[in-house]
């Protein structure tokens, strides 16, 4: 590419992100990118700008030293691409990003005045828990085509189809009736039997007598778009809907190649063409997902014999085994019983050398496994329990609940919690059609951008680690392992699955094929 054209495109790319290059920085970049083809230029410039934005910038004027550091970081990440094929990311290793309303971008924790998270959170952590959930949904909703301000000079019909969000403070400051308003807020029950709508500016009592609820499971502590009118200090709701979802590609178009997901990669793995190529070429890759692996049940261990014998000619990439790992939780002998059960599973795995040597085993603890209560995120099973198993099965990882798995360019979230029943029990208004609960459930999770949109007394969360339960940007695969009936639902380019309870569902499990992004329902019957 001609140097002048390359220089022009480089300067334009930085200007689009609100950055200006010093002449020395422009010259350095033009020389560094001289050998890059026109097809690769846009991708490489995007990565360099992302690396620049990660640095603490004093102004939008970019010096040569900043650009040099960014290019060096990108060069290292290119060399490390092959190491990024498969990564398991525990909840406590997930990076935290905080949305800055003034700059309209997500900043890493290190570039903010927030303290590092701790298990023993402060009162500020609890307040910020809800504030951050609100802020993420607010910025996402504001960008939706229905809520973006109409373009000056656009047709009246187009302007008429736009909506404007109001704050509760605006309503409370009005002395007369305010009709036809839409408010984004959280449903709360500040007084017994009376529901309120809350946002960062205030609270207002709700009148639900005439409210129509769109599809979804509307629980306390979930965020809604409430449409109605305000009169006499009461918001009379006509309709409730959830904040609109957006595909991962749309989120990344706004925020660039930030690695929200976690893992060793500096930028989002979606940007790596080598990983995409590996993913497409490896058509035999598969993930076997099983939940409620009751290792103390002889029948369950027998079924694993059958499963491993079937898969041994073509071992899966990974077995994802979710708890509970005992059928009878608690008790003074639970820890020793679990150690013995894991020893039995290791014996079975060692009988199949092809699986033992090439498949990975990921263990996600369940709500009734030994641990520190039922607060999320849950740490892995204790090392004292798993030490012998890990020595015998080297490719095994005992991780947190929830956890994340990155395979090539695909992002997978695993969460083991009996969530469907909890959400149904805590609904403000149960859906009129209970036939399609999985669809309602999946829509709720993705719209809320959170794995557990429930009150903290129903589903406790470590306040400072609430960000680890985010489902934003939307992953490629969301596994919510629940004792509810197995299901597979696609929403917003995200595949959401529940493998069901292995012993309770007739030994059903799911198999995910990353290259085609398909899920296969499987069952061990008649063996």
From Swiss-Prot:
GO biological process: DNA-templated DNA replication
Cellular component annotations (GO), alphabetically ordered: epsilon DNA polymerase complex; nuclear body
Disulfide bonds: none
Origin superkingdom: Eukaryota
Record's keyword terms, sorted: DNA replication, DNA-binding, Nucleus
Any GO MF annotation of the entry: DNA binding
Pfam families: DNA_pol_E_B, Dpoe2NT
Localization: Nucleus
Biological role: Accessory component of the DNA polymerase epsilon complex. Participates in DNA repair and in chromosomal DNA replication.
Family, as annotated: Belongs to the DNA polymerase epsilon subunit B family.
Further information: In eukaryotes there are five DNA polymerases: alpha, beta, gamma, delta, and epsilon which are responsible for different reactions of DNA synthesis.
Assembly: Component of the DNA polymerase epsilon complex consisting of four subunits: the catalytic subunit POLE and the accessory subunits POLE2, POLE3 and POLE4.
Protein name, as recorded: DNA polymerase epsilon subunit 2
Native source species: Mus musculus (Mouse)
């Amino acid at each position: 590419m001609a140097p002048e054209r390359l220089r022009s495109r480089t300067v334009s790319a930085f200007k689009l992100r609100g950055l200006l290059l010093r002449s020395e920085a422009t010259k350095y970049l033009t020389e560094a990118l001289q050998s890059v083809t026109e097809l690769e230029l846009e991708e490489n410039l995007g990565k360099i700008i992302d690396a620049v934005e990660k640095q603490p910038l004093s102004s939008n004027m970019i010096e040569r030293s900043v650009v040099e550091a960014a290019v060096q970081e990108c060069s290292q990440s290119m060399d490390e691409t092959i190491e990024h094929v498969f990564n398991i990311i525990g909840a406590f290793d997930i990076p935290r990003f905080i949305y800055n309303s003034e700059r309209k971008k997500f900043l890493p924790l290190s570039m903010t005045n927030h303290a590092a998270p701790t298990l023993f959170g402060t009162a500020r952590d609890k307040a910020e828990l809800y504030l951050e959930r609100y802020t993420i949904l607010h910025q996402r909703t504001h960008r939706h085509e229905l809520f973006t301000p109409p373009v000056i000079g656009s047709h009246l019909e187009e302007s008429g189809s736009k909506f404007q969000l109001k704050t509760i403070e605006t309503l409370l400051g009005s002395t007369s009736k305010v009709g036809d308003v839409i408010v984004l807020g959280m449903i709360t029950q500040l007084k017994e039997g009376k529901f309120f709508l809350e946002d960062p500016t205030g609270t207002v009592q709700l009148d639900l007598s005439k409210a129509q609820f769109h599809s979804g499971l509307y629980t306390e502590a979930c965020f809604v778009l409430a449409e109605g009118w305000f009169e006499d200090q009461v918001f009379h709701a006509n309709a409730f809907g959830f904040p609109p979802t957006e595909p991962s590609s749309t989120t990344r178009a706004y925020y660039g190649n930030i690695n929200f997901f976690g893992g060793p990669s500096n930028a989002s793995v979606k940007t790596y063409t080598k990983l995409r190529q590996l993913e497409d070429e490896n058509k035999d890759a598969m993930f076997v997902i099983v939940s409620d692996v009751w290792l103390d049940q002889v029948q369950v261990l027998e079924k694993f014999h059958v499963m491993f014998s079937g898969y041994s000619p073509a071992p899966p990439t990974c077995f994802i085994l979710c708890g509970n790992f005992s059928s009878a939780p608690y008790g003074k002998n639970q820890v020793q019983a679990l150690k013995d059960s894991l020893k039995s599973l290791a014996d079975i795995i060692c009988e199949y050398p092809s699986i033992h040597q090439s498949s990975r085993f990921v263990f996600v603890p369940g709500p009734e496994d030994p641990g520190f209560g039922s607060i999320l995120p849950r740490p892995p099973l204790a090392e004292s329990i798993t030490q012998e198993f890990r020595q015998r099965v080297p490719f095994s990882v005992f991780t947190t609940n929830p956890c994340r798995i990155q395979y090539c360019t695909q992002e997978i979230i695993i969460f083991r919690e009996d969530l469907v029943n909890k959400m149904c029990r805590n609904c403000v208004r149960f859906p009129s059609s209970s036939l399609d609960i999985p669809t309602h459930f999946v829509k709720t999770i993705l719209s809320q951008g959170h794995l557990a949109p429930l009150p903290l007394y129903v589903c406790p969360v470590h306040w400072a680690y609430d960000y680890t339960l985010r489902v934003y940007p939307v992953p490629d695969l969301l596994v919510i392992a629940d004792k509810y009936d197995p299901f597979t639902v696609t929403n917003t380019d995200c595949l959401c699955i529940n493998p069901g309870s292995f012993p309770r569902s007739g030994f059903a499990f799911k198999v995910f094929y990353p290259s085609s992004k398909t899920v296969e329902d499987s069952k061990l019957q008649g063996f």
